[in-house]
């Protein structure tokens, strides 16, 4: 959407280069693919869920020329390694980048590595000095924690919401994004999840995106979304909504066993529901609230 930071930033880049912009009334995977060929689009910007829907259109992709695409830039949600591989398969000429920014603090948070190291495909980039930091409790130079930002683009506050504004800033004036990041050995950051998406299962903190990435490494899983349901003993437990790849007959038990073999036991989904596609919000992110509402029936199945 043009009222979000990504839409605004990309428009500025295009206008600065005297380039045209293709705007669609709403996202539809088939129309998106057709527009790329019709207008010979060179740069795509999207949310990961959009590209996950695009790569599923095998029949249309096989008859459409997408060779014009040189850059695919994603943001606003975690990107899995499997999705990157799928995009490279259908867009072999394209460079894939994963970006980050917030409407409250602008798009300039991450940049190039000072030693020229290549950005890993699923990383959001290297933090710009004095603009981004990871905070874990009193540690403001953490390797794993909430991302805080401070730069000239940071908003003065939310309009007529003084309490929400106060909650959004640290005592020393940094904007608290609510996004959990981790840093690798080279200093690149990776999106882990949202502070408000995290839930506790039997004393263990679970970030849904970590479980989703693990599940999406399975060769027969196209997409996965994990939401919590209440549990009298554990507090909350994970439930997974899964889109299988075409032709797959992967079972619920097969997914549970895969999760137990490839991640901590507490992360494995107690119930798996198969869906044709995941619901999206108006900003093309996965609509977790709608899945939350559907997870109650899944909770009853696990009793």
Region locations from a protein language model:
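Short hydrophobic/charged patches on amphipathic alpha-helices used for structural packing
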Residues: 30-33, 61-63, 166, 212
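Conserved ATP/PPi-binding loop(s) of AMP-dependent carboxylate-activating enzymes
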Residues: 126-129, 138-168, 204-206
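Conserved AMP-binding/adenylation subdomain of ANL enzymes
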Residues: 3-42, 57
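Gly/Ser/Thr-rich phosphate-binding loop
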Residues: 16, 41-46, 55-119, 133, ...
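AMP-binding/adenylate-forming catalytic core of the ANL superfamily
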Residues: 44, 151, 156-157, 180-267, ...
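Acidic/polar alpha-helix N-cap and adjacent early helical turns
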Residues: 293-303
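Active-site glycine-centered loops adjacent to acidic/histidine catalytic or metal-binding residues
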Residues: 76, 101, 125, 179, ...
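Beta-strand->loop->alpha-helix junctions that form or flank phosphate-binding loops
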Residues: 96-104, 123-127, 227-230, 273
């Amino acid at each position: 959407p043009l009222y979000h930071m990504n839409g605004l930033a990309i428009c500025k880049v295009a206008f600065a280069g005297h380039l045209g912009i293709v705007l669609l009334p709403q996202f539809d995977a088939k129309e998106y693919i057709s527009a790329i060929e019709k207008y010979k689009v060179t740069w795509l910007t999207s949310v990961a869920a959009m590209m996950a829907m695009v790569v599923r259109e095998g029949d249309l992709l096989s008859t459409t020329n997408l060779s014009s695409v040189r850059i695919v830039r994603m943001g606003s949600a975690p990107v899995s390694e499997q999705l990157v591989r799928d995009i490279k398969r259908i867009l072999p000429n394209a460079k894939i980048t994963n970006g980050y920014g917030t409407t409250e603090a602008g798009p300039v948070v991450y940049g190039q590595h000072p030693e020229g190291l290549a950005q890993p495909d699923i990383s959001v980039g290297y933090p710009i000095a004095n603009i981004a930091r990871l905070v874990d409790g009193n540690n403001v130079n953490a390797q794993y924690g909430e991302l805080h930002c401070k730069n000239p683009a940071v908003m003065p506050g939310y309009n007529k919401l003084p309490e929400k504004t106060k909650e959004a800033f640290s005592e020393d004036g940094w904007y608290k994004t609510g996004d959990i990041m981790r840093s690798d050995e080279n200093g690149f950051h990776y999106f882990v999840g949202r502070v408000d998406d995290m839930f506790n299962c039997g004393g263990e903190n679970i970030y849904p995106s970590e479980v989703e990435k693990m599940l999406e490494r399975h060769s027969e899983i196209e997409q996965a979304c994990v939401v919590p349901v209440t549990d009298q003993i554990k507090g909350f437990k994970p439930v997974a909504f899964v889109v299988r790849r075409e032709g797959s007959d992967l079972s619920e038990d097969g997914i549970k066993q895969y999760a137990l073999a490839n991640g901590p036991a507490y992360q494995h989904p107690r119930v798996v529901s198969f869906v044709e596609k995941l619901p999206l919000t108006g900003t093309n992110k996965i609509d977790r609230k709608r899945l939350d509402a559907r997870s109650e029936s899944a909770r009853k199945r696990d009793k």
